[in-house]
């Protein structure tokens, strides 16, 4: 397993013998999801989105009408910057401002696995069994940071979590904060859920993923026989 960073193309590549996960820093600000799947040797710099002026799409950079966050595959999307899909996080400061201004601000590549404080997580017996990429997003206006953690193992597994740090003096209300987000390229996907009842657990339900919202949850406070985690 290995984590590399290609400076010229601003591309992170997490990989082992089985899988690859590729992230690119776009416009020196935004994290774009490029690839997750079977192991590749290298992310080719020629594999890029075709940018053109799209109607009804907001442009965060006034000088470039071909670039819109609403059409990108995002790693950790925000609200209030022109991406009208579901955000990974939402906030409100004491002035009632809800616009997020977190931009890419560096990275670290670490040996081993970083454990999220107070949350369940997998473990390793030695630091040689995993590598972790830490990416920093910073809001310099409010003096806030979000740390994104990606850990790759010897097996075909990538685990993720996020951490919010308030470096400022003013309180911030966190209205929404997900552990991860994943945007996938347009294809025909199925949603697979496992539902059931007592002594009749894990009935498989499969349906096409359409242009809608699907929520799988349990109000029991734990995974139960009624609804198990989705795939």
Predicted regions and their residues:
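Short, Gly/Pro- and small/polar-rich lid/capping loops
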Residues: 1-9
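Acidic (Asp/Glu-rich), glycine- and aromatic
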Residues: 15, 28-29, 36-39, 52, ...
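Conserved small/polar residues in nucleotide/adenosyl-binding loops
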Residues: 226-231
């Amino acid at each position: 397993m290995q984590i590399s960073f290609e400076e010229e193309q601003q591309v992170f590549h997490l990989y082992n013998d089985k899988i690859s996960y590729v992230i690119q820093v776009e416009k020196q600000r935004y994290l774009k999801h490029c690839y997750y799947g079977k192991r590749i040797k290298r992310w080719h710099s020629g594999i890029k989105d075709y940018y053109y002026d799209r109607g009804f799409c907001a442009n965060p950079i006034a000088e470039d009408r071909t670039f819109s966050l609403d059409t990108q595959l995002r790693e950790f999307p925000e609200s209030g910057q022109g991406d009208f899909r579901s955000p990974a996080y939402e906030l409100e400061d004491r002035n009632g401002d809800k616009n997020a201004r977190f931009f890419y601000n560096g990275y670290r590549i670490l040996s081993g696995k970083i454990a999220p404080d107070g949350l369940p997580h997998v473990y390793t017996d030695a630091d040689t069994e995993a590598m972790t990429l830490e990416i920093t997003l910073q809001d310099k206006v409010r003096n806030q940071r979000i740390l994104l953690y990606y850990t790759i193992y010897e097996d075909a597994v990538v685990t993720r979590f996020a951490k919010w740090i308030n470096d400022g003096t003013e309180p911030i209300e966190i209205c929404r904060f997900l552990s991860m987000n994943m945007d996938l390229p347009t294809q025909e996907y199925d949603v697979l859920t496992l539902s059931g009842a007592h002594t009749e657990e894990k009935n498989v339900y499969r349906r096409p993923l359409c242009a809608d919202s699907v929520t799988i949850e349990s109000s029991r406070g734990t995974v139960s026989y009624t609804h198990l985690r989705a795939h």
